[in-house]
């Protein structure tokens, strides 16, 4: 959900970050390394995709927003723009030094295929080993003029100070419930009570709210919450804790957005 957006105007919240990105694109003052720091489901991946799309767009508007119609935008929207590279990792919880060497260091020296920039998006960047981060240092210190690296993380605290000091940090704040509710009602075509419950459950993370709104588990979650609220006064503490844990477990299927 949400990844088919082709414009910053469609994003829920994060106006200050969008303004910063649009300004950088518009004035051509783009840094070589960014960290998008925010909780799971906060919208990091979407912002990174739109940032990359607008940097590569062949026909940007005066706000620095992507046109969504040129060849580059169409390629970016279907994830096959040759100069937007998403770094992957074999091991489930580690981005290794080999991943970084093969996918960034050895590749970044090759000029862009068809665009002004060559952009690397690194999801789960907090999984980079210390060796992987050290391997990146030289690249971040002396990047080619066309290179932009965007790290996505929910914990920027694990980066080495030498990496942090060379990146522009953009922190995603929780989005106000009312903003999420209005978005869900308009775009997911759901009634207000449904939208409010999704927004409350998402705790300021639009990506999570959108996934929840479309989730087949929604009715089940709703009845669990109502049951909990009705019985809360008569429940033993252990039962209460178990109920809350059950409700929180629905979160597992919400991938990062």
Where do the protein language model's features map onto the residues?
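Hydrophobic residues in beta-strands of the RecA-like P-loop NTPase core, especially within AAA+ ATPase
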Residues: 36, 122, 136-137, 153
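Charged, glycine-rich active-site and insertion segments that engage polyanionic ligands
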Residues: 5-54, 75, 145-146, 155-257
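Conserved catalytic/switch belt of AAA+ P-loop NTPases
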Residues: 134-151
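Clamp-loader machinery-focused feature within the broader ASCE/P-loop NTPase space
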Residues: 2-131
């Amino acid at each position: 959900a949400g990844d088919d957006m082709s414009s910053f105007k469609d994003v829920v919240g994060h106006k200050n970050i969008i303004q910063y990105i649009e300004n950088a694109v518009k004035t051509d003052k783009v840094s070589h390394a960014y960290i998008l720091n925010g909780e799971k489901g906060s919208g990091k991946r979407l912002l990174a995709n739109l940032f990359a799309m607008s940097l590569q767009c062949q026909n940007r508007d005066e706000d620095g927003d992507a046109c969504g119609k040129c060849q580059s935008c169409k390629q970016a929207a279907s994830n096959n723009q040759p100069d937007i590279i998403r770094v992957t990792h074999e091991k489930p919880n580690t981005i290794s030094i080999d991943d970084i060497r093969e996918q960034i260091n050895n590749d970044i020296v090759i000029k862009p295929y068809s665009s002004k920039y060559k952009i690397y998006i690194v999801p789960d960047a907090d999984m980079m080993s210390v060796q992987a981060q050290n391997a990146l240092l030289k690249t971040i210190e002396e990047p080619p003029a066309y290179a932009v690296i965007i790290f996505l993380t929910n914990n920027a605290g694990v980066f080495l100070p030498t990496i942090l000091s060379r990146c522009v940090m953009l922190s995603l704040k929780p989005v106000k419930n009312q903003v999420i509710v209005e978005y869900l009602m308009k775009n997911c075509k759901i009634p207000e009570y449904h939208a409010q419950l999704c927004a409350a459950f998402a705790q300021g993370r639009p990506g999570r709210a959108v996934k929840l709104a479309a989730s087949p588990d929604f009715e089940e979650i709703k009845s669990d919450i109502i049951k909990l609220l009705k019985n809360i006064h008569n429940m033993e503490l252990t039962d209460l804790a178990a109920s809350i844990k059950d409700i929180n477990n629905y979160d597992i299927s919400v991938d990062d957005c």
